[in-house]
Amino acid sequence: MQLNVNDAQAIEVSELTFGGEFNETLVHQAVVAYMAGGRQGSKQQKTRSDVSGGGKRPWRQKGTGRARAGTIRSPIWRGGGTTFAARPQDHSQKLNKKMYRAAMRSILAELVRTDRLVVVQDFAVETPKTKDLLGKLNNMSLTDVLIVSDAVDQNLYLAARNLPHVDVRDVQGSDPVSLIAYDKVLITVSAVKKFEELLG
C-alpha cells in the first residue's frame, strides 16, 4: 500500500503494518497492560499486628462490666490497625510479544485510516527554541501532536519540552498509550521504515 508524504512523493509501505484491521479488544488489553506495568505498587498500611504496642490486654477478660478487649491496637480502636490493610503488590500483566506487536500494528493502521498519521521526509529544528518548533507546527496546523522519529534529535527534544500538548519519541520509545493519546502523530519516513522492521 502507499502512504502519502507531506513534503515528498508517496512511499510504499507494508500492508501488514499499516493496513490491517483495528482490533479494539487487543489494543485495550495492550493499553491496560502498559499502564498497569507503570504502577508503583508500593502502597502499604498496617494491620493490628504491625502497629506498635498493644501487647498487653487493656483490662481483664471478665468482671469489669466493659466489653472484652484483647489489644488497644484493634481496628475498632482509635490508633489501631487497618482491617484489610493494603500490601505491596505487582500490578503488571503478561502480554505476549506477538500480541503487543499486533496491537501496535492495529493502532498504526487505525491512525492511517482516520487521517491522524502525518508522514514527513524529515523533521528537525536548527536551534533548541520552543518558538521555532511552535512556528513549524502551526504552519502544519498541528496543536496536539506526538512527533516520532528514527532517533530523537536533541534540539527537537529541548524545543518540545515546554509544550504541554507536544511530545517527542523515537520508534523504540513509542508505546500504545502515547500513539493513541494525541490528535495527530507526526512521523518521519525513516521512522516508518523502522516500524516496518520491528512490527513486520
From Swiss-Prot:
Record note on quaternary structure: Part of the 50S ribosomal subunit.
A GO MF term: rRNA binding
Family as reported in the entry's similarity comment: Belongs to the universal ribosomal protein uL4 family.
Pfam family, one: Ribosomal_L4
Protein name: Large ribosomal subunit protein uL4
GO biological process: translation
Gene3D superfamilies membership: 3.40.1370.10
Keywords for the protein's UniProt record, in alphabetical order: Ribonucleoprotein, Ribosomal protein, RNA-binding, rRNA-binding
GO CC annotation terms, alphabetical: ribonucleoprotein complex; ribosome
InterPro entries, alphabetized: Ribosomal_uL4, Ribosomal_uL4-like, Ribosomal_uL4_dom_sf
